[in-house]
């Protein structure tokens, strides 16, 4: 009986949260949510959290706030306020479950939209790398963001970025070239790889030249 009473809040929260998961799936499939539905799902997610404090519920709440911010316009006053709520919810999720590479990256991306300082963004990016160095879903966009705030990285951390660049290159030459197809990116990549991975850099340059 005692075991059942302990488990019941978790079960009740999971059942309550089903509509939120359905809504998040719609967002992931780029299917629009009416504003009223998104607002209702936010309240449902908050109720799930009140029933059982779970990192996934906080992450879903963050996603819903982010979705609403996008609909309002990220740089509008309303959008900025919603982004702050999205960031707060993401931090709560990471407090409960820190080993979430995708969410650390998402939080760094939100920081960019909130005009946070590069060193603040860099810390989240490093956490994303440390908790998921081979997380292919965020490997390339994370690297693009890292390169945009490169001066905030210490030398030891730049060595980590060099390894990440090699991993992304080895994963798919075609996707790498598409993602980093600009002289500015290649200048930065060259600076990172010249001493640490000269042969890989030579291979990159050769393939980039054949595409132009």
Residue ranges and their predicted role:
Residues 149-212:
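Terminal, low-structured helical/coil segments at or just beyond the last alpha-helical repeat
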Residues 22, 26, 43, 64, ...:
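Charged/polar, solvent-exposed surface patches and flexible loops
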Residues 1-16, 211:
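Extreme N-terminal leader/anchor segments
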Residues 7, 48-49, 73, 115:
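A general structural-boundary detector
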Residues 76-147, 153:
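Non-cytosolic head/periplasmic domains of membrane-anchored proteins
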Residues 1-6, 38-48, 78-92, 119-129, ...:
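Alpha-helical repeat scaffolds
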Residues 31-37:
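Conserved alpha/beta-domain cores
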Residues 11-29, 50-73, 97-110, 136-148, ...:
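Amphipathic alpha-helical repeat scaffolds of TPR domains
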